């Protein structure tokens, strides 16, 4: 990280016009998943959305894409002011968050599901946990955090692969102060967990898929998706089952600049570069695959 630029005022931000955003590419279906930073989410009094991800099912190219969004970036708020993206849903609602992602990144995503951390924990438990390979530093952090001895199988010790229960997986996805890559690390860990779960369901049957869907619908805080929308999304997911998940961080590191704004550590973003990179990822003219 470079020293924070002490700018009196961030650069102006010019979002795109929502109503003239292009239609999704043929076969691509986007859904926004957001997780608030408390265990029990209250739809009428939301916390900060610390985890925001766009899931894309590309049924034409048989691709499964996870695009995560950095929590510290500055965006134009619905009132025209500038603020961190993590406060948009709390202050303006989840529709406003989906709209903000759409207009800043140039991809219209209007269907969303919002979770609390307890929802994510229950869903991962319902799916039988998730195998995760951790570094020594991550293992130390999880032990210092005092996750229960039975939170992973075997009990967390040092670097290696463990089966994580839901609670431990949520703590893992929230790690920020390990490895020196801050929020980028947190974004990467979110993509790792989702990608691993997807790969566990490579050969999913309809019965299993419906069980996964009911674990989601039983454990969400807020959504604008009808049951019909959910079943449609499940159909798309089954069409791309078996695809190797691809992940992208938005904005990319090189399109962000640290800036202290309103006494907060934030990131000023080159949205034009970000939109071009995201478009290229969706166009598949080049593919960025997480390690």
Question: How does the language model describe each region?
Answer:
Residues 1-291:
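Non-catalytic, solvent-exposed segments at the cell envelope interface
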